[in-house]
Amino acid sequence: MIIVISPAKSQNFETATAKYQFTQPIFKDQITKLINTLKHYEVDEIEKLMKISPKLAEEVFTKHNNFDPKSYSELNSKAAIFTFSGDVYKGLEADTLDKKTIEYAQNHLLMLSGLYGLIRPLDLMQAYRLEMGTKIKIDGEILYKYWQDKITAQLNEYFNQQQNKILINLASNEYSQAIDKKSLDAKWLDIDFKENKNGTYKTIGIHAKKARGLMTRYILENRIENISDIKKFNVADYKFNLELSNENLMCFTR
């Protein structure tokens, strides 16, 4: 079983992490090509490309020009699972997971990324900003097309080493589209979280994101290897909702 989640725009490179056997990014050549392309963008071009403020564009410009694709070390990088700090990662709270769970996550959790493609928890990563939906072309292809075959092939390689070939999709639509479902050698299971608002169940972005992190933590801590055990999730008042679920979707409501 493999879980996929989205990355986060917010990243924390300040806090030190415990010592682990850190790993190198999976797609170094592809990352190098992408970052070298991004280095050609001036501040005003970044602002237009990413639809961000001038101040943020300057920060992104600095990040990308400081990026060294030839060297990933603890001097310029940090393990991905401890670096991302958005809503999903607030739910995951990786800093409070024990060492054995982090090591288990290394083989069962992957983060999708516009720059890195796929990131394992202990992969060293440098600061960047590149969403999968950014309208930049590499070799004449948009990011989805650039990454889709590479990401899917790598996932299939991982599934060849897994006993239970199930992909638990806890990523957003923006990122999960970078995987070719039809070519995936595994069952695909979506998980959704909804809130009861005046008798109607609705997906509320900020709550759903944190819940994805909570679910990721639950699966990792409990070493869950089959779908039926996921239904037992009852964190933060969420409960499995049979009526809103089907063979390919598990919905949890509160």
Curated annotation (Swiss-Prot):
Pfam families given for it? H2O2_YaaD
GO CC: one term? cytosol
Question: What's a single GO BP term from this record?
Answer: response to hydroperoxide
Disulfides per UniProt = none
What superkingdom does the record give? Answer: Bacteria
Q: Which family does it belong to?
A: Belongs to the UPF0246 family.
Give the protein's recorded name: UPF0246 protein Fphi_1075
Q: Which organism is it from?
A: Francisella philomiragia subsp. philomiragia (strain ATCC 25017 / CCUG 19701 / FSC 153 / O#319-036)
Q: Lineage of the source organism? A: Bacteria, Pseudomonadati, Pseudomonadota, Gammaproteobacteria, Thiotrichales
